[in-house]
Amino acid sequence: MAKKFDKDSFSGTLIVVLAVSLICSVIVAGAVVGLKPIQEKQKLQDKQGYILSVAGLMDKDTDIGKTFAERIEQRVVDLATGEYVADAPKDFSARIAGKDPAQSIRIKTEDDLAGIKSRAKYTEVYLVKGEDGKIGQIILPMHGNGLWSVMYGFVAIQPDGNTINGITYYEQGETPGLGGEIGNPLWQQKFVGKKLFDGQGKLALHVGKGAGSDKEHGVDALSGASLTSKGVQGSFAYWFGENGYIPYLNKLKSAGAQ
């Protein structure tokens, strides 16, 4: 005669616990798989929102997907040549490519002003079209190390390749109230109208204590956050240097954003 299952025994309790754990793990795994498309869609919308924001095209009533499709053209640039990559996939991500040795380069220590060690060979850029369909701004991704985190942002510049229209940081883990103020629109506003380069084409934008007195190129560092501010300076120094966007910006100046 088969022994009756005793759920109150040690073995019975163990079986019940294992069964419940298995069922719960299946439910959780299913939820993760089911929610992933929703999470990816939200992530894309958030990114598009930041791009529209730095372009000055975002308010509380903005239809993000519609406005992005109408006003933003995403292109992929070969950073070594400054040329557009004609056959780049629509879903290309420099952030993902940067983790693939075949799609990225190691940065020499002496050149690594942003402290990022490596970067993708290609990157996305975003051309902002005006009401007349002409390119009025170019939005360039930028990232670099701060005190505690890698700081990811966008810089909007005019077609002259020199004048800043805006910046935003959309992902960072700096100290709240100190370095975290890189996400404060009031501080970001200080970059608007600044020139990246001097008359000889050398990077002149600088972020530091008292730098705001230089009305053309300077931005005051964040109070109490000298290392984060130094990280912002390093990010600009790398990405707007010869190993970053200079080849692309030179193409813009000679041939136009189109």
UniProtKB/Swiss-Prot annotation:
Recorded topology in the membrane: Single-pass membrane protein
UniProt xrefs under InterPro entries: FMN-bd (IPR007329), NqrC (IPR010204)
Q: What does this protein do?
A: NQR complex catalyzes the reduction of ubiquinone-1 to ubiquinol by two successive reactions, coupled with the transport of Na(+) ions from the cytoplasm to the periplasm. NqrA to NqrE are probably involved in the second step, the conversion of ubisemiquinone to ubiquinol.
> Can you quote a single GO CC term?
plasma membrane
Localisation per UniProt entry: Cell inner membrane
Q: Which GO-annotated molecular functions does the record name?
A: FMN binding; oxidoreductase activity, acting on NAD(P)H, quinone or similar compound as acceptor
Q: What SMART domains does this protein map onto?
A: FMN_bind
Note the Pfam families from the entry: FMN_bind
Q: Which organism is it from?
A: Neisseria meningitidis serogroup B (strain ATCC BAA-335 / MC58)
Q: What PANTHER family does the database record attribute to this sequence?
A: NA(+)-TRANSLOCATING NADH-QUINONE REDUCTASE SUBUNIT C
Catalysed reactions, semicolon-separated: a ubiquinone + n Na(+)(in) + NADH + H(+) = a ubiquinol + n Na(+)(out) + NAD(+)
Respond yes or no to whether keyword Disulfide bond is given for this record: no
Which protein is depicted? Na(+)-translocating NADH-quinone reductase subunit C
Which residues are listed as membrane-spanning? 14-34
Q: Mainly localized where?
A: membrane
In the UniProt record, what gene is named as encoding this protein?
nqrC
